[in-house]
UniProtKB/Swiss-Prot annotation:
One of its GO terms (biological process) is carbohydrate metabolic process. This is Citrate synthase 1. It comes from Bacillus subtilis (strain 168). Homodimer. Its EC number is 2.3.3.16. The lineage of its organism: Bacteria, Bacillati, Bacillota, Bacilli, Bacillales. It catalyses: oxaloacetate + acetyl-CoA + H2O = citrate + CoA + H(+). Might regulate the synthesis and function of enzymes involved in later enzymatic steps of Krebs cycle. Loss in activity results in sporulation defect.
């Protein structure tokens, strides 16, 4: 029997996260991810995912200091970023540059110090590249800012408002980890050969680049832009459904009810955007889409997923579409590293089989 896409196949045991698709729950190390996102900092969430518990005050400060100390880009990385073509997409740049971090010190077994460096430096790579292609002066990281604030600052040169900071932080926390998805699987497969951490997350970045995995928020933005006005929503959505096309930002392969991440992001989008026209349109499109999905796909119970409100949050904090997947990747670096570290603890190389469908040569009698 062939399990296409490995759907329904359990290949590892993990204590990092749990997705309960029937009840709409995402759990990080024994805690509801929604609660962590709404009530804790990115650094606390990252510590939880990496080390299995929330940090004490002292542990948190040490962790913050370590992250801040690893934000600066080495000179060879700056030169590499500058040398890449301006029309090279951001995810290809990120994949290429991260792979260049793989010095001889990165070997099997991976170390938490290596993970901390990758988590800290990835936003710096994204921000440096974005400003370089815009012809803007690079902004050095600031130790006075936390992980999320510093990312925003290095991109824009400004300190975010508290509402914008918390909206971005909520999104990044909810993007840190989501079970055995395609990119996490890629990372664990690579590490299972006793390769190094940089190679593993480089493989994950290559997987994240695919539009079926990392590109959905951009597609949601395009849909909202195509609709434009609330009065156009019904006709647009009906046309899509009648053609059998997918509504971007609705439904999830795992969740059979409301995506808990979407609920948290909706709350933050409303806080930062207030009466913003774009958010008002998004709320209207959500209501219309759910109503029409019940008519066109009765019994399917398709709800808004995280990508829908990720797009709303990113628009509300003035991040352009090109930053969606890189920001997602900077967040997911935490989960990738945690899974790679976990894989190394009880490693076995992945070696599934394939069912051959080609011809068999006839036996020649001697």
């Amino acid at each position: 029997m062939v399990h296409y896409g490995l759907k329904g196949i359990t290949c590892v045991e993990t204590s990092i996260s749990h997705i309960d698709g029937e009840k709409g729950r995402l759990i990080y190390r024994g805690h509801h991810a929604k609660d962590i996102a709404l009530n804790h900092s990115f650094e606390e969430a990252a510590y939880l995912i990496l080390f299995g518990k929330l940090p004490s005050t002292e542990e948190l400060q040490v962790f913050k200091d370590k992250l801040a100390a690893e934000r600066n880009l080495p000179e060879h990385i700056e030169r590499l970023i500058q040398s890449l073509p301006n029309n090279m997409d951001d995810m290809s740049v990120l994949r290429t540059v991260v792979s260049a971090l793989g010095e001889n010190t990165y070997t099997f077994h991976p170390k938490t110090e290596e993970a901390i460096r990758l988590i800290a430096i990835t936003p710096s790579i994204i921000a440096y590249r974005k400003r370089w292609t815009r012809g803007e002066q690079a902004i050095a990281p600031s130790s006075q800012y936390g992980h999320v604030e510093n990312y925003y600052y290095m991109l824009t040169g400004e300190q975010p408002s508290e509402a914008k900071k918390k909206a971005l932080e909520t999104y990044m926390i909810l993007a840190t980890e989501h079970g055995m998805n395609a990119s996490t699987f890629s990372a664990r497969v690579t590490l299972s050969t006793e390769s190094d951490l940089v190679s593993a997350v480089t493989a994950a970045l290559g997987t994240m680049k695919g539009p079926l995995h990392g590109g959905a928020p951009s597609a949601v933005t395009k849909m909202l832009e195509d609709i434009g006005e609330k009065e156009h929503a019904e006709a647009y959505l009906k046309e899509k459904l009648e053609k059998g096309e997918r509504l971007m930002g609705f439904g999830h392969r795992v969740y059979k009810t409301k995506d808990p991440r979407a609920e948290a992001l909706r709350q933050k989008a409303e806080e930062v955007a207030g009466n913003d026209r774009d958010l008002d349109l998004a709320l209207h499109v959500e209501a219309e889409a759910i109503r029409l999905l019940e008519i066109y796909k009765p019994g399917r119970k398709l709800y808004t997923n995280v990508e829908f409100y990720a797009a709303a949050v990113m628009r509300a904090i003035d991040f352009d579409d090109e930053l969606f997947t890189p920001t997602f990747s900077a967040s997911r670096m935490v989960g990738w590293c945690a899974h790679v570290l976990e894989q190394a603890e009880n490693n076995m190389i992945f070696r599934p089989s394939a069912q051959y469908t080609g011809a068999i040569p006839e036996e020649v009698l001697s």
